[in-house]
């Protein structure tokens, strides 16, 4: 890859803080140099405000197709569990081409919203009816194709899913597209690694779905396949899950995991909504990341993660769009803070210190935690030499940013403007979004609309 045209910004958020008149040069998808306090050059591409791109550490991209389709109350109590049945029905008719179309639409929206990398928690492995594809990586390849088409950075997280509940309970018939045994999962994982080779900079981790879906021996077998990469798991999302885990093991889910697995900085514990104080301390001590998905957790009525207590233990977190019911990086951060305000009846509760900007505190924590969760061995986070050239520019003309400078820009973006203030987005040095619109949006959106009309009709 040839050297790109230098980018010049009136102000940029660098690791040391806000810096004026910054030129960023890149080569081979990475930042090759950063010059501070320099006037724009004749060859520079000029912009106003630069931020690092945020990692999206947890996504089920195909669920973008469900957005807006589950907002009708069920006959009985409506919850995560009733929503899950609707999701199972939705995927019964979905083929590989349709799956890829849904993924591509979600990835376009992520890039337009300021996410430049995604951790795809990928558990749909088999054909309709549950028959394995001839290529066990068929649908992993469709995730990779959607990422390559849109340009988003990809960490693919193939999911091991074998059971319907704790203790090796039999799976439900509607879960058959997810299922494998350890040997079958090893084939899926190897095929997934082959599938992402054509995606620049892509990585692969592993994802035991949840303690509900794996037995202890299966968990050990799956972890042995991880090759030192990231490990993601759903955990303690629902109170019912906690109660059933206590009935099975006399331990809470996170408590059991910390006692029975070598949880470390490679791990991302997704949701962890109903963590106890001792569990929060344990996660922080192991330097694992908690993957928070505030919009999905609110949509599903999961509960509110105890973020204030976790922060007191210096816990690490990142954010994810999960079900992709709405894709907006700023709104995930805003809802995280606002949910804590409601719970604690206080303001600016996640600001890192007295006088600190809440927006900056949230942004930098999510940047560091997301980077660790997706690339735990990679050095260089944010806009620094050697890091991936993943960058977002904000529009100086957005009314919500008028008169703002420094950390007030982040506060205005997160708590007011959201994705409407995003101008351009670069991933690995390639400009994918300009004037707030992805360069492939028209074709991808048209394909998505055709697919969704068919799927909605088929699921009716």
Go through the PLM ranges and name each one.
Residues 388-445:
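C-terminal cap of metal-dependent C-N hydrolases
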Residues 126-272:
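Metal-coordinating catalytic core of metallo-dependent amide/deamination hydrolases
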Residues 259-262, 266, 308-397:
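His/Asp/Glu-enriched, well-ordered alpha-helical/loop segment
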Residues 65-101, 127-136, 163-183, 239-264, ...:
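Active-site gating loops and adjacent loop-to-helix segments of metal-dependent hydrolytic enzymes
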Residues 68-153, 183-199, 449-460:
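Alpha-helical scaffold segments that flank or form the walls of functional sites
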Residues 52-64, 230-239:
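Histidine-centered catalytic micro-motifs
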Residues 10, 29, 47, 58, ...:
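Divalent metal-coordination and catalytic microenvironments
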């Amino acid at each position: 890859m040839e050297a790109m045209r230098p980018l010049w910004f009136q102000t940029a958020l660098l690791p040391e803080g806000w810096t004026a008149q910054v030129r960023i040069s890149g080569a081979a998808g990475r930042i090759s140099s950063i010059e501070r306090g320099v006037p724009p050059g004749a060859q520079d591409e000029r912009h106003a405000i630069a931020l690092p791109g945020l990692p999206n550490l947890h996504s089920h991209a195909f669920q973008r197709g469900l957005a807006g389709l589950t907002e009708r109350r069920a006959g009985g109590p409506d919850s995560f569990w009733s929503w899950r049945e609707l999701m199972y029905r939705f995927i019964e008719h979905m083929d590989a081409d349709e799956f890829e179309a849904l993924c591509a639409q979600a990835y376009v929206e992520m890039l337009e919203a300021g996410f430049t990398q995604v951790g795809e928690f990928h558990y749909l492995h088999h054909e309709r009816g549950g028959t394995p594809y001839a290529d066990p990586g068929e649908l992993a390849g469709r995730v990779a194709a959607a990422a390559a088409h849109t340009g988003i950075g990809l960490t693919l997280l193939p999911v091991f899913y074998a059971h319907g509940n704790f203790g090796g309970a039999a799976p439900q018939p509607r879960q058959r597209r997810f299922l494998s045994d350890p040997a079958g999962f090893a084939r899926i994982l190897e095929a997934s690694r082959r599938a992402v080779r054509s995606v620049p900079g892509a990585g692969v981790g592993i994802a035991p779905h949840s303690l509900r879906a794996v037995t202890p021996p299966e968990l050990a077998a799956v972890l042995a396949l991880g090759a030192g990469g990231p490990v993601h798991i759903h955990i303690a999302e629902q109170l019912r899950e906690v109660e059933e885990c206590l009935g099975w093991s006399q331990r809470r889910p996170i408590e059991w995991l910390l006692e029975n697995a070598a949880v470390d900085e490679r791990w991302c514990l997704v949701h962890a909504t109903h963590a106890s104080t001792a569990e929060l301390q344990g996660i922080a001590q192991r330097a694992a990341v908690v993957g928070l998905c505030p919009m999905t957790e609110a949509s599903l009525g999961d509960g509110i993660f105890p973020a204030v207590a976790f922060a007191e233990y210096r816990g690490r977190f990142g954010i994810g769009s999960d079900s992709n019911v709405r894709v907006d990086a700023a709104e995930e951060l805003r809802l995280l803070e606002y949910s804590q305000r409601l719970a604690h009846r206080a303001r600016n509760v996640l600001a890192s210190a007295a006088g600190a900007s809440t927006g900056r505190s949230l942004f930098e924590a999510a940047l560091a935690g997301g980077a660790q969760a997706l690339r735990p061995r990679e050095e260089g986070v944010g806009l620094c030499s050697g890091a991936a050239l993943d960058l977002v520019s904000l529009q100086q003309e957005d009314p919500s940013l008028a008169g703002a400078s420094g950390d007030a820009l982040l506060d205005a973006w997160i708590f007011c403007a959201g994705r409407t203030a995003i101008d351009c987005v670069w991933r690995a040095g390639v400009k994918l979004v300009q004037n707030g619109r992805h360069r492939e949006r028209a074709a991808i959106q048209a394909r998505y609309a055709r697919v969704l009309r068919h799927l909605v009709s088929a699921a009716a």
